């Protein structure tokens, strides 16, 4: 059996983690023969709840799970990590300005970035889920200068999966028959879900999504807004934010980093924009279409971008730039 992989999940007493931990521990992410050490971090007031989560993990009697470490201390949590999944963040409270939310989260992710820098392996893969995910990821990256920038990514896979699901529902096909949708930009309502490079398998033949759907107005209108606003729609219906679907997306995201993407397919992740060929400013955590091989991602180059896409890609880049400026302001006065 290989050496155990050491995986941290923060916000471990929360509802996304509750759906996520079982998936990781039973081998959905790192494979069915990869032993694991799970490290669970949360804030001190949540430690009693976290004890209950640990009990349940023990009660699952999972063969791959070699050890569970629950802690409220960053120096314990970040020690010698292979993978860090940063789910915990300050949630937006009613009446809270986005700026206040950014400020609270800069503090958290600056501290966690510094802990990654100090205690984790330099090869650690860091996945940021807690919102605002792109800017939180940028903050952590900037606070961990000894870890390669490429090791940081943030979750837009939930949006990616939502986009696949909407096209599949529209055409009454399996979501697996829809490939190469793209989420560009920020994990916010300015994100751009782009179907113009997607294909759909109809009767055994791959057809462009626009040709398959035969409704350009829908793909350029309702499809985009549905994906952009899906998180809010789930909250409205369930009175809780997406947890099961978020956990599934995290599993997909991390599994693809670990094992790579299938040939001819790409996925969406927020990564550092340096050196991209799409005219997106450098030094932003921006969601691009990626292929992954040997645990290394590469932006898919050379996709033709029409005026409709250009405008939407630039709009979400502008929002990310503004978030970054605000975060850097807070970072420098922390």
Swiss-Prot record:
Q: Which reaction does it catalyse?
A: (S)-malate + NAD(+) = oxaloacetate + NADH + H(+); (S)-2-hydroxyglutarate + NAD(+) = 2-oxoglutarate + NADH + H(+)
Record's protein name: Malate dehydrogenase, cytoplasmic
Keywords from UniProt, A to Z, are: Cytoplasm, NAD, Oxidoreductase, Tricarboxylic acid cycle
Quote the HAMAP family the UniProt record gives.
Answer: Malate_dehydrog_2 (MF_01517)
What does the sequence similarity comment in the record state about its family? Belongs to the LDH/MDH superfamily. MDH type 2 family.
> Which amino acid positions bind NAD(+), per UniProt?
11-17, 105, 112, 129-131
By its UniProt entry, which InterPro entries does this protein fall under?
A: L-lactate/malate_DH, Lactate/malate_DH_C, Lactate/malate_DH_N, Lactate_DH/Glyco_Ohase_4_C, Malate_DH_AS, Malate_DH_NAD-dep_euk, Malate_DH_type2, NAD(P)-bd_dom_sf
What is this enzyme's class at the first EC digit?
Answer: oxidoreductase
Kindly list the biological process annotations in GO that this record carries: malate metabolic process; tricarboxylic acid cycle
Q: Where does substrate bind?
A: 92, 98, 131, 162
Q: Which GO terms describe its cellular component?
A: cytosol
First-listed, main subcellular location of the protein, grouped into a coarse class: cytoplasm
**What is the purpose of this protein?**
Catalyzes the reduction of aromatic alpha-keto acids in the presence of NADH. Plays essential roles in the malate-aspartate shuttle and the tricarboxylic acid cycle, important in mitochondrial NADH supply for oxidative phosphorylation. Catalyzes the reduction of 2-oxoglutarate to 2-hydroxyglutarate, leading to elevated reactive oxygen species (ROS).
Q: Which cysteines are joined by disulfide bonds?
A: none
List localization entries. Answer: Cytoplasm, Cytosol
Citing just one GO molecular function, the answer is: L-malate dehydrogenase (NAD+) activity
Pfam families registered for this protein in UniProt: Ldh_1_C, Ldh_1_N
| Protein species of origin | Xenopus tropicalis (Western clawed frog)
EC assignment: 1.1.1.37
Complex and partners: Homodimer.
- Active site, per annotation: 187 (proton acceptor)
